[in-house]
């Protein structure tokens, strides 16, 4: 059995909808194999939602105009194709737009049903004069890739329903490059860098995870031919081993103040792993453990790259400490003892 060092994946966030993913070390040649597969999957096979057809009050086809609207129907359709939407529904759903002029019609004027969200509300769709009025239905469906208006046209559809091109993919751009990286004395391993930019409907890490899931499912078909076939097995992750070692450390290694240490010990918290399983709210329930003790613990854990469990949204440890009377500085009934 051949055992290779397990690669690690790290994310470098460029902005909210663009990230670089670094996968290393990879066996020589696997950088391009994996990079090309991920890129093609990200661009073509990530599920999304888009408008598939519209119906405008008083309009029978796209080669016409709407009274009081500056843009003709063709321009209006081009603007609608720029809508970024997401839908939780597997079946088609309808959004409604009703606007009276004068003024701009934006995506914020669209009323989506529950489970559907418009992610670029500032998008300008049309311009109305004082007498202008726009009433429109927009049908949203889920899918993958690109579907033309011709394909969206349904047999026997109602008169006045106009199919539009649908771009379902939430991914805007994907590039990758492969660099050399070193493992001990060897310098021919691959380092894969994948740059992913998405629409507002999905974050890059979610798109990357979706692509990975799709590829695993497809490559699993080949594996099922002979599940006992020999391949390259991935060794244990160095990161996982280091994390396990940190979590197993006794809290004595944190070198906390005597007060904080004794409070944790009395609560039955003996290791770093048991400590990070508690939230700030949990720790404040411990007698004599106040906001200053929490700040001390958080600072020690941050130095190890760890953190406490998430507290409920809006939780303020200082306010909670005041409310429960947990005071680090004044407690007449508390007697400090040496660490035991």
UniProtKB/Swiss-Prot annotation:
It comes from the Bacteria. The N-terminal domain is essential for RNAP assembly and basal transcription, whereas the C-terminal domain is involved in interaction with transcriptional regulators and with upstream promoter elements. It catalyses: RNA(n) + a ribonucleoside 5'-triphosphate = RNA(n+1) + diphosphate. This is DNA-directed RNA polymerase subunit alpha. GO terms for biological process: DNA-templated transcription. It comes from Streptomyces granaticolor. The last 19 amino acids in the C-terminal part are cleaved in the spore. InterPro entries: DNA-dir_RNA_pol_insert, DNA-dir_RNA_pol_RpoA/D/Rpb3, DNA-dir_RpoA, RBP11-like, RNAP_asu_C, RNApol_insert_sf. GO terms for molecular function: DNA binding; DNA-directed RNA polymerase activity; protein dimerization activity. Gene3D superfamilies: 5' to 3' exonuclease, C-terminal subdomain, DNA-directed RNA polymerase, insert domain, RNA polymerase, RBP11-like subunit. It is an enzyme of class 2 (transferase).
């Amino acid at each position: 059995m051949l055992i290779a060092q397990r690669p690690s994946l790290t994310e470098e966030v460029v902005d909210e909808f663009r990230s670089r993913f670094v996968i290393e070390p990879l066996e020589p040649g696997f950088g391009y194999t994996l990079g090309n597969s991920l890129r093609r999957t990200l661009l073509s096979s990530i599920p999304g939602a888009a408008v598939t057809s519209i119906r405008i009050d008083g309009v029978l086809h796209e080669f016409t105009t709407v009274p009081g609207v500056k843009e003709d129907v063709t321009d209006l359709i081009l603007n609608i194709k720029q809508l970024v939407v997401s839908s939780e529904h597997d079946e088609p759903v309808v959004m409604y737009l009703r606007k009276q002029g004068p003024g701009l019609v934006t995506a914020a004027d669209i009323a989506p049903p529950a489970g559907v969200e418009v992610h670029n509300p500032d998008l300008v769709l049309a311009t109305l004069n004082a007498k202008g009025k726009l009433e429109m239905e927009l049908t949203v469906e889920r899918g993958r890739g690109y579907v033309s208006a011709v394909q969206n046209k349904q047999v026997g559809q109602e008169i006045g329903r106009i199919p539009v091109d649908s771009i379902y993919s939430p991914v805007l751009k994907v590039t990758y490059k492969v660099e050399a990286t070193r493992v001990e004395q060897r310098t021919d391993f691959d380092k894969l860098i994948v740059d992913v930019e998405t629409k507002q409907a999905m974050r890059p890490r979610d798109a990357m995870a979706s692509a990975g899931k799709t590829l695993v499912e497809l490559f699993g078909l080949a594996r099922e031919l002979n599940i006992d076939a020999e391949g390259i097995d991935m060794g244990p992750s160095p990161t996982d081993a280091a994390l396990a070692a940190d979590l197993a450390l006794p809290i004595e290694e944190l070198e906390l103040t005597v007060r904080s240490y004794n409070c944790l010990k009395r609560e039955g918290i003996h290791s770093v792993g048991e400590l990070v399983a508690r939230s700030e709210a949990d720790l404040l329930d411990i007698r004599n453990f106040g906001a200053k003790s929490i700040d001390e613990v958080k600072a020690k854990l941050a130095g190890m790259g760890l953190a406490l469990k998430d507290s409920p949204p809006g939780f303020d440890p200082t306010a909670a400490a005041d409310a429960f009377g947990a005071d680090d500085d004044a407690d007449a009934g508390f007697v400090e003892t040496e660490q035991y």
